[in-house]
Regions:
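Hydrophobic residues embedded in beta-strands of well-ordered beta-sheets
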Residues: 75, 148-149
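Ferredoxin-type iron-sulfur electron-transfer modules and their immediate structural context
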Residues: 1-136, 140, 163-165, 169-175
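Terminal recognition/anchoring or ligand-binding modules at protein termini
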Residues: 160
Length: 175
């Protein structure tokens, strides 16, 4: 016989926490409220952060399990309802949603690849690529790519050291 593989349960996660309180708007948008349309408007949408969640809920409409809701301008996933079907991942035009292990504790809640000063100007909780998280991680599970922290969940020991050192609080607990 063939031995069955054990599959890690996955869940969708939105890599952005730039809600209405943490990022500003460059202009008032009054067009079609569909995230797929925003890349065609000036600066890719009204939010100062060009990498952040647009907050118009295209992912909400795509989810057949009612697992995503817009909270204060940013999509949030209900881990209990999410079945990791990937429909939200496929439809997000900013590629902010990914499937991560359901038991992943620390996650980078930012997708900005802008340099630190640009990110700081756009969002109060954006990753600035400072590498303090990399230096703090005892398991060598964190790296910085394109001015952005990335956690290898297979190496992560969930100690919280990266999260504690992050000056922008871009690394959070996945609740």
């Amino acid at each position: 016989g063939v031995e069955a593989e054990t599959m890690t349960p996955m869940v969708a996660f939105v890599h952005c926490q730039g809600d209405c309180d943490k990022t500003s708007q460059d202009y008032k948008y009054s067009g079609v409220e569909d995230c797929r349309m925003l890349p065609f408007v000036p600066n890719g949408g009204p939010k100062s952060c060009n990498s952040g969640c647009l907050g118009y809920g295209t992912c909400v409409k795509a989810c057949p399990f009612d697992a995503i809701h817009i909270v204060n301008g940013v999509a949030k996933v209900d881990k209990q309802k999410c079945k990791a079907c990937g429909k939200c991942v496929a439809i997000c035009p900013k590629h902010l949603i990914s499937l991560i292990p359901a038991d992943a504790r620390e996650v980078v809640a930012c997708s900005s690849t802008d340099k630190g000063p640009v990110t700081m100007k756009a969002c109060t909780t954006g990753c600035i690529g400072c590498s303090l998280c990399v230096k703090a991680c005892p398991a060598d599970a964190v790296r910085v790519e394109n001015f952005h922290a990335v956690i290898d969940h297979e190496k992560c020991v969930a100690c919280g050291a990266c999260m504690e050192k992050c000056p922008k609080k871009a690394i959070i607990i996945n609740e």
